[in-house]
């Protein structure tokens, strides 16, 4: 995943005992829909003119994201590339996509941090973590 690659790169110039990895307690919900003719016209001459879709996102805490997926009747599946659960559903003229930060994805990150014997882990944003997160962190970090 991305964290593993980032740590590998950082370790080329920073000793493991000086490196702290940051992990998120939030996830982003992405919404993508085709651009209108007006939006294409407004984007003319900019880099955005090359993209056929309008994209926006919003942040959700771990528990809120799980509730949202459930309320939409969507199913999650494991994305081995990102090491996250993923869901998508259609609505409002477009597609909603979410790669979840949850205890499963967090554990994958903590395994990489422990394997590389890093100095520690930093989490953000406090208050957005799901239940069971701190017990999981204590299993991997002293």
Give residue spans per PLM region:
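Solvent-exposed, polar/charged alpha-helical surfaces in well-ordered, non-transmembrane soluble domains
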Residues: 5-8, 104-115, 135
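Aromatic-rich peripheral "rim/lid" segments of glycoside hydrolase catalytic domains that contact
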Residues: 81, 112-115, 127-142
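Active-site region of glycoside hydrolase catalytic domains
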Residues: 1-35
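Active-site proximal loops enriched in glycine and acidic residues that flank catalytic Cys/His/Asp
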Residues: 23, 125-126
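Extracellular/periplasmic catalytic domains that process cell-envelope and extracellular macromolecules
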Residues: 12-16, 90-92, 114-116
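Glycan-binding loop/region signatures in secreted carbohydrate-active enzymes
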Residues: 23-112, 141
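Conserved, mostly hydrophobic/aromatic
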Residues: 21, 113, 121
């Amino acid at each position: 995943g991305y964290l593993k690659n980032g740590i590998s790169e950082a370790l080329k110039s920073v000793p493991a005992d000086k490196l702290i990895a940051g992990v998120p307690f939030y996830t982003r919900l992405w919404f993508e829909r085709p651009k209108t003719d007006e939006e294409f016209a407004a984007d003319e001459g900019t880099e955005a003119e090359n993209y056929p879709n309008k994209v926006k996102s919003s942040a959700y805490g771990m528990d809120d994201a799980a509730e949202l997926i459930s309320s939409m009747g969507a199913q999650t599946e494991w994305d081995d590339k990102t090491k996250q659960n993923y869901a998508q559903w259609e609505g409002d003229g477009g597609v909603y996509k979410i790669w979840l930060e949850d205890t499963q994805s967090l554990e994958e990150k903590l395994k990489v941090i422990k394997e590389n014997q890093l100095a520690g882990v930093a989490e953000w944003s406090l208050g957005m973590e799901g239940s069971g997160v701190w017990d999981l962190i204590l299993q991997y970090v002293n």
